[in-house]
């Protein structure tokens, strides 16, 4: 089982981008030293409290300051960029990291970035599929042509090709019910979360992925990664109370975003967002602790993650150590250290 840290490069209101980068890079350095397997980088656009609109660029900076840790995107929002350019830049990162890059991709469940770039969100699913096809063709063919609804290229040659053969590992994020069996049929590793869907629902979604994966005849073991807020402290009371304000801030912010998106969308997407927002609104801190986060002493977190591993067939856990962006730096460091030294060894 692998373990990682999700890094959003968050910046408080009125903060300094340079400080946000420095603080995040310090976290990456500590993760490398403590033996984490992977750093996962977000992609945010038009978001004042995030400074990671270009995760490939940030990944190259991380490659230059680390030697061992895998650098993953979680996720690159493929429909927002020209897929040829993504193929070039991702392959370049694979080179400068000496083959330590993992290509995590998705289409995002939110419309804000699409609106900013002038791309209809209704096109996101088909754009994503075309973009992924273009990128894999670019990596595995000397020259190629492609004709789709949104992207067309004639006899192009993408250089460099990735270091990893045939290409970096591709992991696809899934949140909607219909996406899971599609991903299972394709056979790509899966990235999931518990933020907007109850654990029972995610369990059913992963089961549909597993069924489609097996029916498609894939021989490799399934690979399922869970992103989840994590907080570890030696004292039980501290572990249960210290992250409450920050973690609940994240869920309330997500609730408001889903409500706003639900009001803008039409048809089933609107209903789904509104339903998920209502589900989050009904949850208090005790509810969140039960199935949305992993918090407690090292022993408690081991037990929580063990249950999730069993229910969701997990092969990887990516921890969010500062969900909500209000955890003090010294508490993040303590939580990360305890996670690496006392939680991970029990779950390997």
Q: Predicted regions: what is each one?
A:
Residues 32-33, 59-67, 90-101, 181-185, ...:
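Acidic (Asp/Glu)-rich catalytic clusters
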Residues 2-19, 79-146, 150, 189-191, ...:
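Flexible, glycine-rich active-site loops centered on histidine and acidic residues
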Residues 1-71, 165-168, 338:
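N-terminal beta1-alpha1-beta2 module of alpha/beta enzyme domains
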Residues 122-158, 200-314:
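An alpha-helical appendage that flanks or caps ligand/catalytic pockets
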Residues 7-21, 76-84, 164-174, 231-233, ...:
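Active-site mouth loops of central-metabolism enzymes
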Residues 38-58, 62, 77, 109, ...:
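Glycine-rich, proline-tolerant flexible connector loops at the mouths of alpha/beta enzymes
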Residues 3-7, 39-41, 71-73, 101-105, ...:
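Hydrophobic faces of well-ordered beta-strands that scaffold small-molecule active sites
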Residues 3, 31, 35, 43, ...:
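Conserved, mostly hydrophobic/aromatic
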């Amino acid at each position: 089982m692998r373990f990682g840290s999700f890094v959003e490069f968050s910046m408080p209101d009125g903060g300094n981008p340079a400080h946000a980068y420095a603080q995040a890079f310090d976290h990456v350095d500590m993760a490398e030293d403590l033996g984490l397997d992977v750093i996962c980088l977000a992609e945010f656009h038009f978001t004042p409290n995030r400074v990671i609109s270009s995760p490939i660029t940030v990944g190259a900076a991380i490659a230059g300051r680390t030697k061992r840790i895998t650098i993953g995107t979680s996720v690159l929002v493929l429909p927002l960029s020209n897929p040829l350019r993504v193929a070039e830049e991702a392959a370049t990162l694979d080179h400068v990291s000496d083959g330590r890059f993992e290509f995590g991709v998705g289409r995002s469940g939110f419309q804000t970035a699409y609106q900013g770039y002038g791309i209809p969100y209704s096109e996101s699913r088909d754009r994503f599929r075309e973009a992924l096809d273009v990128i894999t063709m670019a990596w595995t063919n000397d020259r190629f042509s492609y004709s789709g609804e949104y992207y067309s290229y004639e006899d192009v040659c993408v250089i460099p090709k990735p270091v990893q053969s045939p290409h970096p590992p591709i992991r696809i994020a899934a949140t909607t019910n219909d996406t899971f069996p599609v991903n299972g049929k394709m056979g790509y590793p899966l990235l999931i979360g518990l933020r907007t869907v109850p654990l029972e629902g995610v369990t059913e979604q992963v089961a549909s992925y597993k069924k489609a994966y097996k029916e498609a005849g894939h021989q490799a073991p399934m690979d399922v990664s869970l992103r989840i807020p994590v907080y570890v402290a030696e004292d039980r009371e501290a572990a249960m109370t210290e992250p409450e304000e920050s973690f609940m801030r994240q869920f309330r912010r997500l609730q408001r975003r889903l409500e706003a998106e639900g009001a803008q969308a039409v048809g089933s997407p609107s209903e789904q967002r509104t339903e998920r927002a209502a589900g989050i609104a009904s949850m208090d801190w005790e509810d969140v602790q039960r199935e949305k986060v992993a918090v407690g002493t090292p022993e408690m977190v081991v037990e929580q993650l063990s249950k999730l591993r069993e229910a969701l067939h997990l092969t990887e856990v990516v921890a969010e150590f500062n969900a909500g962006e209000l955890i003090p730096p010294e508490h993040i460091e303590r939580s990360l250290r305890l996670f690496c030294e006392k939680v991970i060894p029990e779950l390997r």
